[in-house]
Amino acid sequence: MARSLIIAACGAGTVGREHFLAEYGRLADRLEREGIQVALDRFSALPSRRAFRDKDPHGFQEFLAQLREHPPRAKAQILRGVLLRRKTIFELEPQLKTLQVPTLILVGDQDEPCIEPALFMQRHIPHAGLLTLPRSGHQVNLEEPALFNLHVSEFLSAVETGRWGSRTEPRT
């Protein structure tokens, strides 16, 4: 059983679900027909990826180089088998309310698809706290590694020493 949870950049596809399903379904088809560069071009153009590209061009290129190594067919299967089939964060509300472990939720303020789901999780997980990193996108751990690791370390220390308690007032 987990003693704590760290949730980062989670929930894309929760808001605007129909658009998400259609867009990623098309991307899966294109990956199989045209190869991995299709995904790289799409990822590079997303507003939620811009912060990483602008902050650390070399790191962003390294990230793309690693993605380039992924087999396109496998990537398409992951899109269809996981992303397009998973429940939205909103649909997980009953399960979120039962989580009884300290939880740190991290999101970049430019990761628009994940902001509303992050707020939702923070409101429905009893022992959750939310950290929004400024001028950061979807890869908060890669864009701001020192800041990310500092907050994760502080969270784990608070959990270990019993300083991460529950909220005093229940949320709806």
Which ranges hold each PLM region?
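Flexible "cap/lid" loop of the alpha/beta hydrolase fold
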Residues: A2-V38
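Conserved alpha/beta-hydrolase "acid-adjacent" motif
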Residues: E112-P117
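Conserved hydrophobic packing residues within short motifs/helices of P-loop NTPase cores
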Residues: I6, L104-L106, L131
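Short beta-strand/loop motif that positions the catalytic acidic residue
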Residues: T98-L99, I105-V107
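Cofactor-binding loop segments of dinucleotide-utilizing enzymes, especially the Rossmann-like FAD-
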Residues: C10, G108, R135
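Catalytic active-site module of serine/aspartate enzymes centered on a nucleophile-bearing elbow/loop
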Residues: H127-T172
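Hydrophobic, aromatic-rich cap/lid helix
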Residues: R42, Q61-L92
